[in-house]
């Protein structure tokens, strides 16, 4: 699917599986290869992941995704980051949410059979809670004038992984802004032609401000 949407991107010619240290990387891309560290995909209940030392690096809200079904998701995310590197959360909240939302939309196109919660890195309960709270989340961001915030702290609080959201409580994941960004993209895409919905290169190039203005997003 990546080659279909990004035909000019040279896919890795070799896939290398290995078992490395528990604090090592789970996926990396070289000049012509992709390396996958299986030690990072043993299943979230693996005894290896329960040690205090391991949880210093990867607390449960991260290791909940260390299961075999996340191998293709992690690989696709890394390939996408190689194709279109994202910023470091410095352009303001709404722009960063939409840029991350673009990548979630693309991820779903690349891996259409993967569960939506898994693509976000949320548990099933977190995803359901976020879906149910979407309108309240958006209204809060508007009410508190956070949508256009350029404060890097606010951006990080809403887009970085965490066990829960400091704004929306224990049931909502820390990076809830990624979900909102994806919903804005989905709202915008509903107004595009079928051909444009599959033009992922054009999506990446489309200014976030233009997408937001045209999305008419209102959950």
Question: Where do the PLM segments sit?
Answer:
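Acidic/His-rich structured neighborhood in mature extracellular/periplasmic domains
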Residues: 1-127, 197, 201, 205-208
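A cross-kingdom marker for long, charged
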Residues: 94-219
């Amino acid at each position: 699917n990546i080659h279909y949407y990004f035909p000019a991107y040279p896919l890795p010619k070799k896939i290398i599986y290995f078992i490395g240290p528990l604090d090592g990387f789970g996926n990396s891309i070289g000049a012509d290869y992709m390396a996958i560290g299986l030690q990072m995909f043993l299943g979230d209940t693996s005894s290896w992941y329960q040690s205090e030392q391991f949880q210093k690096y990867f607390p449960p809200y991260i290791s909940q995704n260390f299961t075999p079904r996340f191998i293709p998701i992690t690989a696709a995310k890394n390939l996408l980051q190689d194709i279109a590197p994202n910023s470091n959360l410095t352009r303001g909240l709404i722009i960063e949410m939409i840029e991350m939302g673009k990548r979630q939309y693309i991820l779903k196109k690349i891996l259409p059979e993967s569960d939506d919660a898994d693509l976000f890195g949320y548990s099933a309960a977190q995803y359901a809670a976020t879906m149910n709270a979407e309108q309240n989340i958006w209204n809060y961001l508007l009410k508190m004038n956070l949508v256009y915030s350029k404060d890097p702290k606010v951006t990080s609080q809403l887009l970085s992984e965490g066990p829960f959201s400091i704004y929306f409580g224990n049931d909502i994941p820390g990076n809830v802004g990624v979900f909102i960004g994806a919903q804005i993209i989905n709202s915008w895409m509903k107004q595009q032609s079928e051909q444009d919905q599959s033009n992922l290169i054009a999506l990446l190039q489309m200014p976030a401000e233009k997408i937001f203005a045209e999305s008419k997003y209102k959950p």
